[in-house]
């Protein structure tokens, strides 16, 4: 018998916990030729900004031994085109849409939340706070508790009451729990983690940086242990806050690891580039991983690694992840 994979995105029930990660599949059109996008928990869109944005010069991507660096620069058509074209398409396919938003000022984030609140079909908002604050010398919102709280509060204040707001946290901080606390206190309904880590690669042949933008976001298997650590720390501090976990997930077993650390949902990103059907494959593998261990409900193993005595009892019974 298959496991019950239902989970909750704030107050909204999802049929399963597998989502796309923002930035790895546009708004889902690219994946529709490979699988039915309504079959996974939700499509998390590429971050949307108020105005169209060209992004950074090329080269924008560089492979690493265990992942990749990207320096896309939030290229996109802007909120008007998204609302006219992308969101209606997601609705027509029966997909649940978690819309990622990004901005350079607190007011830009708030305006985006207001625009989305007037639209039909927005399941939730993911707030990409890993953007430079143009009003504070380029300080990244996600790296300062006060700035992270200001953005979260502004978005929650402008978003429609029934749209959950998830703040997406950066691992490029010394204390991710303090950032999480600021966002939750400011009204976040949940948290997404982790965003990419800032990295750099130099081409030994050209003797120059591999990316035109010099630095980029590191993703892929290399960052999964960091994601597990961050999820663990935040779940330990906030037992009841919904968490979307992400970072280097390639298999159902990888997803299980994040779930045991405390993730209620798991976003799949970089692996989509070489396996466009990865989301449905990982969903199937997750079900298999749980079922073969006798786990009947996903909810029973969320954060289970925090309960060593309960886990020990399960192990003695021959039924443990």
Please tell me what each predicted stretch does.
Residues 1, 218-240, 250-321:
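Alpha/beta catalytic cores of nucleotide-metabolism and tRNA/nucleoside-modifying enzymes
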Residues 1-97, 102-104, 282:
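N-terminal capping/small domains of soluble enzymes
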Residues 23-24, 247-249:
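Active-site metal-binding loops of divalent metal-dependent hydrolases
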Residues 32, 80-87, 149, 153-156, ...:
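Predominant activation on well-ordered alpha-helical scaffold segments within soluble catalytic domains
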Residues 49-54, 132-134, 198-201, 272-275:
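Short gly/pro/ser/thr-enriched loop/turn and capping motifs at secondary-structure boundaries
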Residues 58-60, 140, 206-209, 281-284:
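Short low-complexity, flexible loop/linker segments enriched in glycine and/or proline
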Residues 104-244, 252-263, 268, 319:
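Alpha/beta enzyme core
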């Amino acid at each position: 018998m298959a496991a019950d994979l239902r989970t909750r995105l704030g107050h909204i029930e999802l049929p399963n916990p597998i989502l796309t990660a923002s930035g790895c599949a546009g708004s889902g059109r690219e994946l529709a030729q490979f699988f039915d996008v309504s079959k996974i928990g939700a499509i998390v869109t590429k971050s949307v900004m108020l105005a169209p944005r060209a992004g950074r010069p090329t080269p924008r991507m560089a492979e690493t031994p265990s992942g990749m660096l990207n320096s896309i620069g939030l290229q996109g058509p802007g909120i008007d085109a998204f609302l006219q074209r992308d969101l209606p398409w997601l609705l027509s396919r029966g997909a649940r849409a978690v819309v990622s938003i990004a901005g350079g000022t607190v007011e830009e984030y708030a305006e985006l939340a207001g625009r989305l609140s007037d639209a039909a079909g927005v399941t939730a908002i993911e707030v990409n706070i890993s953007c430079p604050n143009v009003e504070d010398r380029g300080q990244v919102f996600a790296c300062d508790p006060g700035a992270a709280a200001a953005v979260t509060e502004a978005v929650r204040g402008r978003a429609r009451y029934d749209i959950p707001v998830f703040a997406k946290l950066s691992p490029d901080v010394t204390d991710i729990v303090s950032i999480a606390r600021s966002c939750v206190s400011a009204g976040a309904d949940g948290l997404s983690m982790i965003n990419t880590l800032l990295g750099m690669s130099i081409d030994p042949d050209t003797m120059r940086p591999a990316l035109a933008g010099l630095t980029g976001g590191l993703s892929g298997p290399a960052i999964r242990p960091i994601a597990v650590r961050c999820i663990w720390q935040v779940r330990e501090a906030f037992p009841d806050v919904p968490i979307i976990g992400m970072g280097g997930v390639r298999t159902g077993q990888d997803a299980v690891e994040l779930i045991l650390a405390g993730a209620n949902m798991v976003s799949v990103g970089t692996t989509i580039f070489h396996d466009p059907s990865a989301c449905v494959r990982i969903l199937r593998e997750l079900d298999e991983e749980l079922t073969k261990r006798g786990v009947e409900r996903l909810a029973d193993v969320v954060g289970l690694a925090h309960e060593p005595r309960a886990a020990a009892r399960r192990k003695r019974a021959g039924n443990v992840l």
